[in-house]
Structures are given as structure tokens and as C-alpha cells.
Amino acid sequence: MTWPRQGLAKLLGIEHPIIQAPMAGASTPMLAAAVSNAGALGGFGGSDSDPEELREVVRAIRRLTDRPFIINLYVGRANPYVSAAEDERALKQALAPAHAELGAGEVPDPVDLFVSYREQAAVMLEEHVPVLSSHFGAPNADIVRALKANGTRVIVSATTVAEARHLEAAGVDAIIAQGSEAGGHRGSFAARTGHSGIGTLALVPQIVDAVSVPVIAAGGIMDGRGIAAAFNLGASGVQMGTAFVACPETAANPAYVKRLLHAEPEDAVLTNAISGRPMRVLRNKLVDLLEQHEEHCLDFPEQLSMTRNLRKVAAGTQDAEFLALWAGQGVKLARAMPAAELVQTLVAQAQELLRCHHH
């Protein structure tokens, strides 16, 4: 059976219009290749990889698949970081006991965790990456033009209709309509972040009506029911992150996966406290601790950098209480199965439902 809307699959050169969200920290070349080889679009979150690491990742994926794949990068910040000495001091004080308890040494100074977007984009051009997505807005017009001229498809997240219109004007090939149910960072860039939090069900048809490029639904989609619903809302495809975290091919910490597989939807909270930008994670001691000191929250990504040593130690000891546990509201539907099998299951479920509706 074919999908109700073919545009996106044709645009991206894939069989099934399902994108595995390129999640920084959880994605691996193995996961990306497994998903792509199954006919969907596998991805790798490269936001915190330096340019040469990124090049190696792209080549590693290409050794495992000859199919298209997607790399995600964060668009760099608009304004330089303004040091907030008082807030930094308060946070260091707040985080010191946890560092002592976990044996994580001194609380580190804040740093900008992200490499230059331009340097990363240069590697994307040199390596002819098939699909590039960006979070927190569209790359500069010159970069978008260069990527498109080079054969790379550019897709970007929008959390409001206004953002979607802005992205279409910026020349992106497709738009991810990211509902507030989504795990990880909200891709907001023009909206006053955190105020409206429009859900997927409401956002998708409004963006579909507002733009002429294909729309990819994201946020809370976990199974064939969600995929079929997205198509019925006018989407041309879906992007799913939380659904893939428990696949054995990911780099997700075992403690994170275990917590994810036992979580309730209300455990997935939207907070600025982890990174300095709104992101949905499972509530744990780290969230509680940082939320108690939310008035001292630094900018993104300096806020995230304050807990880098703590999270590193917690990852080593598999302590889920001090990890950033990215998860969307569909978390209870997460399944631990190999990525290829998950793709096949999703396709079968969705097509069964869509077949019924289209007769």
C-alpha cells in the first residue's frame, strides 16, 4: 500500500515517511542505519559533536547504509552569553552537595557546549549529507542556499504557525510541526518560549493550512495510531523520538531506558531548569534540584553545562536521578525492540488504519 501523501517520501528519497528523531546523546550510527535500511529515515543528533566527530559519524552511517539519513544541528545563538556572576555563584552553591554525594568533584564553570554552526555546516556540505534538520530556527539564508544547491534537504521545527510561515519564507524544504507533547527541547525560536505550548493535534492542521511545503508531525506520536492520526490531520509524515529510545541500537544509558519503560505520562515535565530552554524530561532529583533554584537559571546551553560533570558521573554509575531523561508525553507507549522491527511494526499498524479510512 502507498501512503496517502507521497510528497515527503519522494522529497527525502525514502519508502516510509517516518523520521527517527535525531536525538543528541541517544542516537548512534547503528540506530540511524537500522532505521534507514528498514525504509524510514534514520537520524543522528550532532549538535554537541565537533566538526571532525561529525564527519566520522556521517561516514560511519554511510558504511552501514546506502539509504538517506538525517543529521540534526542546533542553530547557534543570536547573542553572546552575558556572564551572570551572582546566578553562577548561587547555582554552584546549590549543586555542590550533589557533586559531593556523587563524587563528581567541583561544580564546573559554565561553558558554551556548542561548536560553531558554520563549521558543522561546512562538514555537512563537504560530506553531502542527504537531509539536515535544525532546531531553534532556520540556519542563515546563505547556509540554506548552499545546502540546497548541494542537494541537501533542509527541514526545521516550528512550534507555532508564525514560525512555520517564517521557515517557509526562509526556503526550507519541509517543516516539522512540533507539538508541546514532544520529548527533549522545544524547537521554538520566534514564539515567546513556554507560553502557549500548542499540542500536536491543534498545531499540525493549522500549519498544514498555512504553508505549501510538506509538514511533518512530531510530539507524542508513538505507534501506528499516532501516525494514522497525523496523516488524517494533513501531515505528510511523522518524526518520532521517544519511541526509538529503548531500541538496543541507541546510546541511551541503561538506567534512562529502564526509567523510560516504567514512566507515566505525567512524569514527563516541561522545564527550563535543565538546559536554560524549555525541554521535556522525566522528573528526577536533578529536575527537582534545579527547579528549586530556577530564578538563577542561566542561558542555554550554559545552564546545561553546569551539570555536565554530575551527569557524566551519573551515567557511569547508571544513576537515573542525575541524568537528563528526555521523554515525550507518549512515554507509556515506548517499546524495547530492535529499530528495524519497530519500523516494520509502525508501518503495518499505520497502514492498516489508513487503509480502513481511505476506502
Stretches found by the model and what they are:
Residues 1-210, 346:
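Active-site entrance/lid segments in N-terminal catalytic domains of soluble metabolic enzymes
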